[in-house]
Structure formats: structure tokens, C-alpha cells
């Protein structure tokens, strides 16, 4: 809808804001307190490590040695031994050859997808791909084919029609909105038949699947030369930052071509130190990933879902965005913080509550979740699917 400009070049914003309100799609910020007073079923702190004393100490120690900021791009003054140590440790953990840190998972996806495709390339992307992957596809200047969710046959068809010099298949390992696992092994078979690269975003797989090493590792593709992994330290590792994991050739190429790497300040030392400490805990305390999955199954049963989750994400589809938002607010008022996903994050008609399981949940917390979720969802059962 084109809104005529009247007295200000930003006068149109009010009309757009009214449209958002009318559609039940307005978003706003809700600052949380330092000490949570509600049960957290919304954050991505899957392993409960963001507040772990060793993780905090790791961040503080790096802060004291290296300072508050990286002070520049990795190619100028922002590169430290600390960055290289985390790259090596993370790559070894997931079974990749080498790694390259970025300032966020979003930046890692932009750098990897754009850097490994470009004009004269074909990108095949899942319809439920994260916004960072979608934006990367748009920026790549490659031909992009979007396939139905987890449809391997559609990917095969797209690759059969490829007339470009190279092709990249892009998927999340665990889809952030619905928690569904991608058919990574089957996608790799298709990619291998057609000589395509498989790029897997392990943002929600790291720390949960494959004993914490991710879904790519779980299905036996760790270190495969035609597989590139992207991930983040902001979820299971409780810190911040992103990484691309793959071959030495991929790393060298991205150092020279990935604009989010070349022109961005390096990841803050405190985030690197915290992520390193979290990774050590994940290696030592192998019970944490399985605890996440067990608690996710419990939450699914509480919500009376027909399918048990295979990740930390428990998706409760309510349909209408206003119903979903009202349910999320009701949960928060009752002491349980849950996620609320509405368009454009999810397709129209599939607005939902997104619950996330954490290793730190216990029987008392799960009982609180049961009481609140049963009461709130019981009030909107007509809209549930």
C-alpha cells in the first residue's frame, strides 16, 4: 500500500504501524530483569550455561587480558590467539577440519552462503530457512530455488535443472520455528549425485543433537569435504558469535571474500572466552544434551502434542496471531515465559507458542510449566492444531 507523503518523509510510518496493530503483528521490547522471576521456556540457553560460573569466569578472564572489544576487523587488529583457539576447539568438537569465527550466527550465514555461491550459481533453500539464510540467498546474486519444507525430492528436481557452474543446498539442521530435523543424510546423497555443496546451519543442533556435536556429526557426515557447517555460540554455548566450519580451502576463501568477516569488528574477547569455557563444560558434562531432549519430550506431553520433539524446540501451533500473543502474555502473567512466533517468522495461519527446553529444568519447574500451560492452552483449545 502506497501512503502519500504529507508533512514528513516518515509520515507513512504511522499508517504502517496501524496495519501491524490491526493484523495482530506488532512487536515490542520487554526488558527482563537480571534475576529472572519467571520460569524460562523461551530463551535459547539450552544447556543452561549462560549463567554458569565457569562460563562467566571465562568471559571475565578474557576481558581482563584482551580488553572490552576486539578493536578492529580480524584482518586489522581484531585477531587474537583466543579467536584461533576457539576456532580450533570448535572445529575439532564437531569433526570439521577448521573453523572461522564471525561476530554472530547471522553474519556467519551471510558470509558463508554469499561467499560460496554468487552469480553463476544455484542455491536451493528450504522454505522454512532462517531469515539470515534467506537474506544471504537474496544478497548472493545467485539463482535461488525455494523448495517445500524438508522435501528431498524437490531438492533433487531443482538440482536436475541446474545449468549453473555450481550449486549449493542450504538447510538448517534443526529448524528454529518448528524444531523439525532436516533430512541431512538424504540431502547429502542428493548433493553428491549432482556435485552440489551442502551447507547446514547447526544453530539449534549444536549442544543438543549428536551428543552435543550436532546433527551433521550424528549422521556421520562430520568432516565430509562437500559439507559446510555454520553455527552460533549464542544458543547452547550461552555466549555470542558465529562460526563457519569446513575445509581449509573454505576458510581461506571466506577470509578473502566474506564481507561480514572482512568489514566487521572481530568478536569481542569476552564472548570468545565465555564460549570456550562453555564448550569445555559441554565436553565434560555429557548428560546435558540428553537432559534437554528428555525435558522437551515432557513439555510436549504437557501440551498434548501428538509427536514428540527431536530437539529443544517444542512448537504449539495456535493459528491466529492474536490468539498466540494472548496465550504468551497469559503464560508470562502466570510466571512462565514462552516464545510467540507470528508472521513473517512463520507462515500465515501458523502462529504459535515456541517453548524451549533447558538442561537446567527440574521436576519442580516442570510442574509449574504443567500447571500454567495446561490452564492457558485449555482456554484456547479451539484454535489449537
Curated annotation (Swiss-Prot):
> Quick one: which residues bind substrate?
27, 130, 345
Q: Which reaction does it catalyse?
A: 6-carboxyhexanoyl-[ACP] + L-alanine + H(+) = (8S)-8-amino-7-oxononanoate + holo-[ACP] + CO2
Keyword Ribosomal protein assigned to the entry: answer is: no
Q: What cofactors does this protein use?
A: pyridoxal 5'-phosphate
Annotated metabolic or biological route of this protein? Cofactor biosynthesis; biotin biosynthesis
- Which Enzyme Commission numbers does its entry carry? 2.3.1.47
State the Gene Ontology BP annotations.
biotin biosynthetic process
The lineage's top-level taxon is Bacteria
Q: Does the keyword Transferase apply?
A: yes
Concerning Pfam families, the annotation shows: Aminotran_1_2
Keywords assigned by UniProt?
Acyltransferase, Biotin biosynthesis, Pyridoxal phosphate, Transferase
Q: What intrachain disulfides are recorded? A: none
Locate the residues binding pyridoxal 5'-phosphate. Answer: 105-106, 176, 201-204, 232-235
Cited function: Catalyzes the decarboxylative condensation of pimeloyl-[acyl-carrier protein] and L-alanine to produce 8-amino-7-oxononanoate (AON), [acyl-carrier protein], and carbon dioxide.
Q: Give the protein family.
A: Belongs to the class-II pyridoxal-phosphate-dependent aminotransferase family. BioF subfamily.
Q: How does it assemble?
A: Homodimer.
> What is this protein identified as?
8-amino-7-oxononanoate synthase
Biological source species: Mycobacterium leprae (strain TN)
Top-down, what is the taxonomic lineage of the species of origin?
Bacteria, Bacillati, Actinomycetota, Actinomycetes, Mycobacteriales
